[in-house]
Design a protein with these regions (language model features):
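RNA pseudouridine synthases
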Residues: 1-143, 147, 179-181
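Intrinsically disordered, Lys/Arg-rich low-complexity segments
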Residues: 143-181
Length: 181
């Protein structure tokens, strides 16, 4: 969770039309291959419209610790899905559409911020650099340019957003990041 008192920033980060990258790990029912993920890479049709192409891949048990701390059990598969929309339950619905319902889901990256150093039940203030990244619209994930079959990407870090007549950023960093599992 990301707590902020800046309503414009919140709107810019959360609205599906802003295309902020979100990275999820999912443990799904059934055996899933990279080839099975192709409909998600092309953009899959859900009941509320066509999704933008996702960046996705099957991940191994070592990478999937957030969703499978005791390892990936037989009959399940761990996947990483990177989306730019953020519709309600989008990742769960996308994976269900290809007949692999989600057993466990974890968002591990939001707009370039990672949760790896935030313990469950704790929080920390964002650094000034992280606040700048968020105000610039986040940054694309590292995997976007290096993975075969990746969805087209845009450089969201180069986009500037204007937040009305708000003056300079507050002197005290009021943004919070909190992970609750």
């Amino acid at each position: 969770l990301l707590f902020t008192t800046d309503g414009d920033l919140s709107q810019d980060l959360l609205h599906p039309s802003k295309h902020v990258y979100k990275t999820y790990q999912a443990l799904v029912d059934g055996h899933l291959t990279d080839r099975d993920l192709e409909p998600l890479r092309r953009g899959i049709e859900l009941d509320d419209g066509l999704c933008q192409p996702a960046i996705c891949r099957v991940i191994d048990a070592h990478e999937a610790e957030a969703v499978a701390p005791q390892g990936v059990k037989p009959g399940t598969t761990a996947v990483e899905v990177i989306i730019r929309e953020g519709r309600k339950n989008q990742v769960k619905r996308m994976l269900s559409k290809i007949h692999h319902p989600v057993i466990r889901l974890h968002r591990c990256n939001f707009a370039g911020l990672e949760l790896k150093d935030v313990a469950k039940g704790s929080w920390r203030e964002l650094t000034e650099r992280e606040v700048q990244i968020l105000k610039a619209g986040g940054i694309p994930p590292k995997q976007a340019s290096s993975k075969r079959g990746a969805a087209p990407t845009t450089n969201t870090a180069s986009r500037t957003r204007h937040h009305g007549s708000h003056g300079s950023a507050p002197k005290r960093n009021t943004y919070r990041e909190r992970y609750t599992g």
